[in-house]
Amino acid sequence: MNVIEILIVLGIILVSVILHELAHGVVAYFLGDRTAKEAGRLTLNPIKHIDPFMSILVPVLLFAMNAPVFGGAKPVPINTRNLKGKEWGMALVAIAGPLTNFLLALIFFLIGHFTGIIYNFNHSMFFFLRECVVINLGFMIFNLIPIPPLDGSRVLYALSPDGVRKFLAQMEIYGVFVVYFLILIFGNLFSGVMAAGVNGMLDFFLKLVGM
């Protein structure tokens, strides 16, 4: 891995996490919550969104270790009491982030497919397009893990009975430590599951275009 590749990956990561968080804020705004807008988070300004640890250090280290890349940005502030639909509104806000990463991955895959670049390892744009697809799929899958405070837990909360909702609410404080624990203690297993998820989505994309 050279300096140029690191800079390319870092650029893709920053754009991907910013659009992910921006999607949360935009959907919340249209569902009645102006918190993100009033906090100045409905912007493409990276300074407003970047978390040095989760937006830069973790993803770059994972890339350097040839592991599936994932990460995050500063969470967009959301006041669920302002949202239309309450729990279901929160689920829509939550799913907007991973859906954005899915759409970004699909768009770049289709660009690579129809230009033939993604099948030409020697093309100057191959690395860029491949990483756009793989990094966004990694972000999508990671954020769909149903452990608070990840987006998947918000969707699970909306779909669950009161007992599960209570458990998820209690986990909110400790959830981020659970995620870090799983990554640190079961790193190889976690990377394997992430890689399987990314490969499964790539197979799905290939089937979409008849490959």
Where do the language-model regions lie?
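Hydrophobic transmembrane alpha-helices and their immediate loop junctions
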Residues: M1-M211
